[in-house]
């Protein structure tokens, strides 16, 4: 085999160690790496190796994860997958049954009567069913990115036979939670059958700690899926979010025999939760049925270490001080329609203005016109934030895709973080974020332009204190982007919407990544792909001409 070529930027030392561990464990293991340390890249490296070694010249990978994680696999695959491999990566969309049918289709099974029909933009190829409903889809053939329409119509076979193929299907963890009856079967049975039809070489569970609950539907089905697939990888930075007993449900998927007891004949049986508790929990309390402590934790750690690689951000000395991570947001059909309608409306307005200026013999680059257009283009940012402004100045909610995705990130990926900052722009956006994020174990501190100075100070001081409560600040970016020092207690900040001014973003970042910060920081950017969100973020990164790029976006023909 030719020397392996990594895709994307060079890997850090801890990522290379993680890949070596997965290889040594024959693809049965865990990457216990903190958010922002590059678990996805390591996993895609291993997936690339599977494709290169595949007897059928196609490696199939099923990824299961929470809402905030699944789109990442489609959007990051082209960056990290080896250039020696052609790749198809998809975040399955549609109803649960449509996702199930799509998964079977990717395995080559023909679906006679698809749920909801094939829909607009669907091809007739057997492996392309419901690809038009995917939340995110990316395909790269011979180093060239294929447009989504072409890929969706052909399915994975669009990759051709020139290079080994890597086919990645990512599904929301909720797909495993369904228990309703489907004829004589439960939905869990239907999902399991679909996984079998897809015939994956590897199953990956992203944010694996979400299957820690022993009795949850998702955890039990994950265990059943794991028993049918040769290779299983779990990814999480918080493997023990609450207690060492959280390990059982996760290792039931990875290696159910790891904590099992050896039988008299020398065979090791799969572990039971009862035996696991006996081995690692101190029981007491009422009638001896309450967990009052833990024991044998060195042995627990030793067994976990046999199949895991650990990376702690502040200990990865070759990591940059700050990590930028894009959080893709799949807008709803209603939000997408509102966005395209507004873009078309602005396009008509601007062209009419251009024609009037041309007739008058005046140029089109005056500052007043540019400022006016920038103000009107703010409507596009409001729409990606879930709100639609009308001509009378009234604003109504049209969806919460972004707020729900951010809430999923906070409660799933960042479940173990006690302090998190969310920066937004619009008042209604902040209200939606507050409602989606707040729960019984998370207190939201909301700060906007109307918050009294004394209340702001009190909230900032509370956030900067040693109070054990889990606190999330949701703030308008201009209210906390300067002269604030208390945010260094957080290692994660999420930009729900980005301001036009680059300096506002830089200043907001500096509130966390500054003197007094004891850990590496991660900045998350919630971006709806192919919208104004992408443009503002790219302008921030590249220091490009924002106005010119925005106008190109407005004038571009719809795809």
Describe every region a protein language model picked out.
Residues 1-4, 10, 28, 36-38, ...:
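Conserved Helicase C-terminal RecA-like lobe
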Residues 500-559:
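A conserved SF2-helicase RecA2
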Residues 70-138, 143, 257-258:
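Conserved helix-turn-beta segment of the N-terminal RecA-like "Helicase ATP-binding" lobe
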Residues 42, 58-79, 241, 245-246, ...:
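Conserved Walker A/P-loop ATP-binding site and its immediately adjacent core
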Residues 177-180, 242-244, 430-434, 456-457, ...:
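SF2 helicase motor core recognition
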Residues 90-100, 173-178, 212-215, 424-428, ...:
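Conserved helicase motor
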Residues 170-178, 190-197, 216-230, 260-395, ...:
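Inter-lobe coupling linker of SF2 helicases/translocases
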